[in-house]
Swiss-Prot record:
Native source species: Streptococcus agalactiae serotype V (strain ATCC BAA-611 / 2603 V/R)
Stored HAMAP family: Kup
Keywords: Cell membrane, Ion transport, Membrane, Potassium, Potassium transport, Symport, Transmembrane, Transmembrane helix, Transport
Protein name listed in UniProt: Probable potassium transport system protein Kup
Function summary: Transport of potassium into the cell. Likely operates as a K(+):H(+) symporter.
Membrane topology label: Multi-pass membrane protein
Catalyzed reactions per annotation: K(+)(in) + H(+)(in) = K(+)(out) + H(+)(out)
InterPro entries: K+_transporter, K_trans_C, K_trans_N, Kup
Membrane-spanning ranges: 16-36, 58-78, 99-119, 141-161, 167-187, 221-241, 253-273, 292-312, 343-363, 373-393, 402-422, 424-444
Subcellular location: Cell membrane
A single MF term (Gene Ontology): symporter activity
Family: Belongs to the HAK/KUP transporter (TC 2.A.72) family.
GO cellular component annotations of the record: plasma membrane
Record keyword Signal present: no
Amino acid sequence: MQHVNHSSFDKASKAGFIIALGIVYGDIGTSPLYTMQSLVENQGGISSVTESFILGSISLIIWTLTLITTIKYVLVALKADNHHEGGIFSLYTLVRKMTPWLIVPAVIGGATLLSDGALTPAVTVTSAVEGLKVVPSLQHIFQNQSNVIFATLFILLLLFAIQRFGTGVIGKLFGPIMFIWFAFLGISGLLNSFAHPEVFKAINPYYGLKLLFSPENHKGIFILGSIFLATTGAEALYSDLGHVGRGNIHVSWPFVKVAIILSYCGQGAWILANKNAGNELNPFFASIPSQFTMHVVILATLAAIIASQALISGSFTLVSEAMRLKIFPQFRSTYPGDNIGQTYIPVINWFLFAITTSIVLLFKTSAHMEAAYGLAITITMLMTTILLSFFLIQKGVKRGLVLLMMIFFGILEGIFFLASAVKFMHGGYVVVIIAVAIIFIMTIWYKGSKIVSRYVKLLDLKDYIGQLDKLRHDHRYPIYHTNVVYLTNRMEEDMIDKSIMYSILDKRPKKAQVYWFVNIKVTDEPYTAEYKVDMMGTDFIVKVELYLGFKMRQTVSRYLRTIVEELLESGRLPKQGKTYSVRPDSNVGDFRFIVLDERFSSSQNLKPGERFVMLMKSSIKHWTATPIRWFGLQFSEVTTEVVPLIFTANRGLPIKEKSELTTTGD
């Protein structure tokens, strides 16, 4: 995914319009595949629905799309951009300084959004493949659901397997394909609507409210659990803000919304005209003339794949942001594309694949998957509402208006949550379990970092300048390396981690010409790349603070190369003679990076709760990327030293010397 140019963020263009269709609307754009089917099946089948039920259902869909997607997300949430980036973690970075507890809705919302990303590919791809059941020449094959499952799993395997290569050139086709998809939704829906044009009366919210309290509605208020399926992609719309820009979303959303609504109207009209059709039919595919069914199934499958791709890429972006905000374990990441917007995280990719395929095998049909779908995303939306309210207060919006907005959307989304909660026993428990597991991991990681920062001992580097200078000139010790670089998570002004000085002075004195201490600070701005240097009045100590945006790669060696060149040019760093080099003009000596692998010792004197957190974090750490990979040091000279996380001074255990005198009997 290419990141939008900042100068055109609020502008719209033809190219941006098409790109937005391929990136932003995959989830919400494939909802017509299964939303009406879910409504009809919960009512008892096509033969059980009435005109008032169809009008009420479409009305509820229209006004759900209007209130949640259009008003909350397109008109309000898109204003909450963090340097042109959207999504729940970008929103959190905007408001996190207002009060510490806002980490709670951020973690819950991020976890539920990630769990939703595992279910969406299963639902959309299965729904599309099930369309083959209405293709006359293939009915004898795909009436057997096992063949549908096999085809779905094959498509999902290919989809997840190609993630490591990036979307590349194929990604450029997503926009045009989705344009064709939405054009088809609108045109086919409009043509089908001519059979019963009264479906357009559904724009009146009266019909939706009437259905909620009508005895004709077999599900009562819980019908909203199916209605909500129409707007599950609204959160993804906000998350993809940085890839396409606000202007392109504002222009493309009306086109998408009209196309989707026409599709629902067309399906509703077809149902009213075909009350005697089989109850097992999906209204979306059944409403298509048989001679075009195969073409539509292919188009729907492509749209489902694109929607799934957008969710998978969005999951990588979500986790990547969480890792840089230090609220998620640092898993190994690669960048298959030519731009920073494309990230691939192998652990997350195959985790999503395992969950997605398990869901397909567990639920077997899209109808059963729909029963579990939507519960997690209602929680995400509620968490976004909380964070959004604080953002509006921060921007100076009157607290009374913010309170009204929070109450309105809180009640609305709360009702959708309660309506979806009934899905818990019908499969919703799966996504809840996934979300709870992710929340547990994020909480352990975050709390563990807080415990370490609270207990770990820091030393004042100024107190050791003399020792370091003396070591540089001590002829009793051989030169360890010309430049020794320590990467540290903790450096506050002149205070550095005690374990670093222990490594230099106590383990085996490391004699060097220059000692570098590098600390990375992740900024709230996504694409910051700045640094600050303090040499503490010497020419042999260099403290470097790298300020990197939460979307930037933390490839320290490449940044350090630039910093060294600039320090040499300015004369702040003395030239370092180099006798042997393929570059005769090189003025820089060799570098050795020291990575301290901090290990938690169970002998540390911690409270039981803190001990549990640290033990869990140590277990999770076995699955994370090594610092060498995380900081891009694979091709540098690196030494990894195992050091204890020193919370308190470890006293020796009591022991007595055994006396050699022994008492013998007579």
